Amino acid sequence: RKENIVAPDGYNRWRVPPASLAIHLCIGSVYAWSVFNPPLTRLQGVVAPAASDWSLGPVVWIFSVAIVVLGLTAAVGGKWLEKVGPRYVGVVAGFCWGGGFLVGSLGIALQQLWLVYLGYGVLGGMGLGLGYVSPVSTLIRWFPDRRGMATGMAIMGFGGGAMIGAP
């Protein structure tokens, strides 16, 4: 439905690119995942590896799952966005992304790697995909005269999120 996507009359469209940049800075922190690999492999033995610690191989795959789910969700979420609008999709993205962190944190606390996969990989990946398409599709429609500049601002945030997300 077009009324879910197009700005109302009198709305300042230049308020959207900074908000899109902020959203993409948050979800772009996924690219800082490699910084968290070493600590995740030493949860029990902080200084030296313990027998109950996770090995690096399974921990690295969590990022891959999140990126695959991002792509799949973005493909499906784009069509869904056409029906319900970017606000609704953006709110669902925020809940998925935040919920993914909560479930993933629970998995770390309980030493259950499958919960980290489910939380950060699947649920967080869904938040990534929906959070990616919502601002970009809005900017493309609201800036037909400056599509490249408007979407570039948002995508810049996705790449810059790794700088902010890495401690």
Question: Where is each model-derived feature located?
Answer:
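Hydrophobic core of transmembrane alpha-helices in multi-pass small-molecule transporters
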Residues: 25, 100, 113-130
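Residue-level signature of mid-helix packing/kink "hotspots" within the transmembrane helices
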Residues: 31, 67-75, 163
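Extracellular/periplasmic helix-loop-helix junction of adjacent transmembrane segments
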Residues: 36-72
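Glycine-rich segments within core transmembrane alpha-helices of 12-TM secondary carriers
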Residues: 144-166
